[in-house]
Regions:
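Hydrophobic anchor at the start of a short beta-strand
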Residues: 6, 38, 77
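Short, glycine-rich nucleotide/cofactor-binding loops
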Residues: 6-22, 50-55
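Short, active-site-adjacent cap segments at secondary-structure transitions
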Residues: 47-50, 86-87
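Short glycine-enriched, charge-decorated loop/helix-capping segments at active-site entrances
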Residues: 53-58, 94-96
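C-terminal structural segments of small proteins and small subunits
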Residues: 86-118
């Protein structure tokens, strides 16, 4: 990673009546647009952010679509495999550009990042 790097950990559920996850993705967009090497890790209830089917039909912001756009802009996005297994969600239900992650991988990302923010 470059001298300026940011890791955003999303553990909050999307579409839970708050803008927490949406703001996390807005921060990622701002960071990557500013030239900051940016990574996002989905953990706990945050893994649902990467599931296209999790978006309610009448939602104002499709968070999974925003996440996919961030990948297209160079943001690395991984999700916790253990959280997927615990929730009973199959990997096939995750958006294709997202990568399977692990606690070991998250630990490595934390070590490599200049800043870590959790939502």
């Amino acid at each position: 990673m470059s001298a300026s790097s940011l890791l955003i950990i999303i553990s909050s559920p999307p579409y839970a009546g708050t803008d927490r996850v949406w703001n996390a993705l807005r921060l990622a967009e701002t960071a990557v647009s500013s030239g900051t090497a940016t990574r996002v890790f989905l953990i706990n209830d945050g893994v649902d952010t990467g599931r296209p089917a999790a978006a309610p039909p009448d939602v104002e912001y499709n968070l999974c679509a925003i996440l996919t756009e961030l990948v297209d802009k160079g943001v690395s996005v991984r999700y916790c495999k253990t959280c997927i297994d615990r929730c009973g969600v199959g990997a096939g239900e995750m958006a294709p550009p997202l990568e399977v992650g692990s606690m070991k991988g998250l630990h490595q990302w934390i070590i490599e990042s200049d800043r870590v923010v959790t939502f």
